[in-house]
Structure formats: structure tokens, C-alpha cells
Design a protein with these regions (language model features):
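C-terminal transmembrane helical hairpin of 12-TM major facilitator-type secondary transporters
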Residues: 299-344
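Extracellular/periplasmic helix-loop-helix junction of adjacent transmembrane segments
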Residues: 54-85
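Central cavity-lining transmembrane alpha-helices of secondary-active solute carriers
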Residues: 74-91, 279-291
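Cytoplasmic helix-loop-helix junction between adjacent transmembrane helices
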Residues: 123, 129-169
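Helix-loop-helix hairpin linking two adjacent transmembrane segments in secondary transporters
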Residues: 154, 163-209, 213
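Conserved MFS/SLC helix-loop-helix module at the cytosolic interface between two early adjacent transmembrane helices
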Residues: 84-122
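A late C-terminal transmembrane helix in Major Facilitator Superfamily
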Residues: 351-387
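Paired small-residue
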Residues: 109, 113, 124-133, 324-332
Length: 427
């Protein structure tokens, strides 16, 4: 008898491009399922941006509280920190408790913690409730992304993961507008928006099917299931992807965070103009995600281009003589970011089997939001060394260019290594 096949890694996305999805990918049921997953993935974005427009009013309300200058901004940022720290643990719970069950529970609890500032009068208690919002966001984001990996395969999976990026970019702009409009009636009013998750939870319970491991591998050989069942968690390959994701998230978020300060340094102080620039850059993220979905290139092939575009955008911002050129640089950067995010996510997903998917996506999600949390700290550190925020963009341009070159070299090396043919077992 021939020797048993060695453990097979999860196939890259292009290798299973023609494989059937685990779930039906047409009809009203498919569209409803996809809508629920995209809506769920937008809930953490709601937590990140909704209250930004009312922070000044919130500061005025708690002006008598010691430490208000630190606590009020923390109410905005602490959910992201909680998400970064707890998403890996949420991934472990996802694999053990079940994706659908945890998603439904987390979506309900999200509404309870999210609306808590409506009746809390202590600023410290509000910040604590915001931290708990981040805990539920970690579970929701991990569950939604993992379910996309469970329900779909190949390029369909890649397309819907990229769609997640598009929905996040669009929803961020929409939530800012909602928060600003609702905030005109009082700083507490925007927190009512968190109750929308109570509408999503019963729909998720009714219309999201219970995921199950796909059985494509069973067709390979009767010996494969036993071997794959003992397959260890892919720590080493996933660690490299997660480290690259932390760095990529810093490149992705820096200009979104620093844009208003850079424009202010050039004399642009009108909030309408700053908002217009932010909306244009958000549109570039959507365009980048669309570009990713419209081609058949693998994530490994896209990453050098994505990091190169981010680096080029930073370089233009660094050398920009006026706000228009600065905005063009930010658009180039965000175009690269729109390609980068789905590339990194699909790359991580391709390394994971069903049993490991929750834990792996939790690690990836934590890495991404850790990079988001670190980006302003990185800019502060670089600015203290090079003397200005604009010059720090030049340092990031150089680092992005180095990463792009290294990824391009790695892609060429992989392309030069022909895969060994798999010997078929005669029946």
C-alpha cells in the first residue's frame, strides 16, 4: 500500500476557486445571510466612531470630574483596545462554544452595554461600560468573520471578506453623520443607536444556518480525515501574517487618524472641508476593496502592490505643498489600504481549518486592532524624533516601501518554486 498522505494545509484561496461553497450562494436566503453578517461586522465600527462628534459636549458635561481630559477621549478609544486584547480569547470561545450561539448572545449584550451611558451619571462608569462594549465587539467581529469563512470558499469567500472591508468604510462615514445629527439633541442621544443590535439578534438566530465542517478533504483519501484531525494549530505561519497585519494596520489607520491635524497645519480648520477630505479617502478604501474582488490575483500577489501604494501615499503627503496634494496622497494611501485589508484577512483565513478558524481569526482581529491602537503612539514617537507630523509620514513611507520590496521578493521566490505533484492513489 502507498504511504499515507502527509497533513494537507488549508488550500490557498485561488486553489479552491472552483470548489462549491458550503452554503447556497444565490437567492433571498443567501442575500439575507450575507446582509446579517455584514451588518454584524459593522457594529464594532459603530462603537469606534458614533460618539466622536459629541465628545466636546460630553467633556463640557463632565468638566468638573478630575481627569476629564483623559477620560472623555478614552470613552471613544477604549473599545478598540478591549477588542485588540480580547479578540484572541474570543476566538478560543468561538471554537468551543459555537459561532452562531456566541454571536447571538454577544449581539444582545452589545446593546445593553452600548446604551448604558443613557442612564449612567458617572464618567468612570461610562468608560467601564465602553470597555465592555469592546469585549462584545471582539466576539461579534470574530464570529462574523469566522462564519464567512465557514459558509463560503475560494473566491466567493475572498469577495465577501473584501465586502466586509467595503461595508466598514462606508458605515464609518454614515455613523459619523448619524452621530453628528443625533448629537445636536444632546450628547447622550447617539447612544440609542446601539439598540439596533436588538433587531439583528433574532434575525441572526432565525436565518443564519449552523455552520459545519466542510467535507471536501474526505474525498482525497480515507486516511486524510484522521491525519487532519490531529493537525496542530498553525502558530508559525499565522504568527507571520499577524505580525504583518499589525504593521499594515498602522499604515492603514495613520492617515485616517492624522488627516485633520495635517490639514490644520496647512491652515484648513473648517470642519466641513476636513469632513469632505475624510469622505474622499474613505471612498478610496472602498475602491481598493472592489479592485481586490474584481481580479483573480492571490493575496500574496496583491500585498506588495498594497504596501507600495500605502508607501507612495505617505510620500506624497510628506512632500505635499498644499491641502489638495495632501488629500491626493491620502487617497493613494487608502487605495492601498483597501487592497491590503482583504489580502491580509484572506491570507490568514487560507491557513485555517474549520476547528481552528475561530481562534485564528480572533488572533488576526486582535492584531489588526492592536495596530489601530498603536498608530497614534507610533506617530507621536516618530514626531518626537524627526520634528514634525509631516516628516513622520516620510518615515512611514520608507518603512512601507521596504515592506513592499520584501513582500515582492518573497512572492517571486514562491513563484519560482513549482509545487510537487500529488500522487493519485489507484482505486
Amino acid at each position: 500500500m502507498p504511504a499515507p498522505l502527509p497533513p494537507l494545509p488549508s488550500p490557498p484561496s485561488d486553489a479552491v476557486a472552483d470548489a462549491p461553497s458550503v452554503q447556497v450562494v444565490s437567492g433571498p436566503g443567501h442575500r439575507l445571510r450575507l446582509t446579517l453578517l455584514m451588518a454584524g461586522a459593522c457594529l464594532p465600527i459603530l462603537g469606534a466612531v458614533l460618539i466622536a462628534p459629541v465628545l466636546p459636549k460630553m467633556h463640557d458635561h463632565f468638566a468638573h470630574v478630575p481627569g476629564v481630559d483623559a477620560l472623555v477621549p478614552m470613552a471613544l478609544t477604549i473599545p478598540a483596545l478591549s477588542l485588540a486584547l480580547l479578540a484572541p480569547f474570543a476566538g478560543v470561545v468561538v471554537d468551543r462554544l459555537g459561532r452562531k450561539r456566541l454571536l447571538i448572545v454577544s449581539t444582545v449584550v452589545y446593546a445593553l452595554f452600548g446604551t448604558a451611558p443613557l442612564w449612567l451619571d458617572s464618567l468612570g462608569a461610562i468608560v467601564a461600560s465602553r470597555a465592555l462594549v469592546g469585549v462584545t465587539e471582539a466576539a461579534i467581529m470574530t464570529c462574523c468573520t469566522t462564519l464567512i469563512g465557514d459558509y463560503y470558499t475560494g473566491r466567493q469567500r475572498d469577495r465577501y471578506l473584501a465586502m466586509q472591508t467595503m461595508c466598514a468604510a462606508i458605515s464609518a462615514t454614515a455613523f459619523l453623520l448619524v452621530g453628528g445629527a443625533a448629537g445636536s439633541a444632546g450628547w447622550r442621544v447617539p447612544f440609542w443607536a446601539y439598540a439596533v443590535s436588538l433587531l439583528l439578534a433574532p434575525a441572526m438566530a432565525a436565518f443564519l444556518p449552523q455552520p459545519r465542517p466542510d467535507d471536501r478533504s474526505k474525498a482525497l483519501s480515507p486516511t486524510v480525515p484522521d491525519v487532519m484531525g490531529k493537525r496542530p494549530f498553525p502558530w508559525r505561519p499565522l504568527a507571520g501574517t499577524c505580525a504583518l497585519t499589525v504593521f499594515g494596520a498602522v499604515l492603514f489607520y495613520t492617515l485616517q487618524v492624522e488627516m485633520s491635524f495635517l490639514l490644520d497645519d496647512m491652515g484648513v480648520t473648517e470642519t466641513g472641508m476636513i469632513g469632505l477630505a475624510a469622505a474622499i479617502t474613505s471612498a478610496a478604501i472602498v475602491v481598493g476593496s472592489v479592485v481586490f474582488t474584481r481580479t483573480g490575483r492571490t493575496p500574496q500577489a496583491w500585498l506588495p502592490t498594497a504596501f507600495g501604494l500605502c508607501a507612495a501615499g505617505f510620500a506624497v503627503v510628506w512632500l505635499a505643498p498644499n491641502p489638495v496634494v495632501l488629500t491626493i496622497g491620502a487617497v493613494i494611501n487608502c487605495l492601498g489600504g483597501g487592497i491590503m485589508l482583504p489580502s491580509l484577512l484572506t491570507l490568514a483565513m487560507s491557513k485555517l481549518e474549520f476547528a481552528d478558524r475561530g481562534r485564528g481569526i480572533g488572533l488576526w482581529t486582535g492584531s489588526f486592532f492592536l495596530g489601530q491602537f498603536l498608530c497614534p503612539l507610533v506617530v507621536v514617537a516618530l514626531t518626537s524624533v524627526v520634528g514634525s507630523t509631516a516628516a513622520s509620514m516620510g518615515v512611514l513611507a520608507l518603512s512601507g516601501a521596504v515592506a513592499s520590496a520584501a513582500l515582492g521578493l518573497a512572492a517571486r521566490r514562491r513563484a519560482g518554486v513549482a509545487p510537487a505533484p500529488v500522487q493519485q492513489i489507484a482505486g
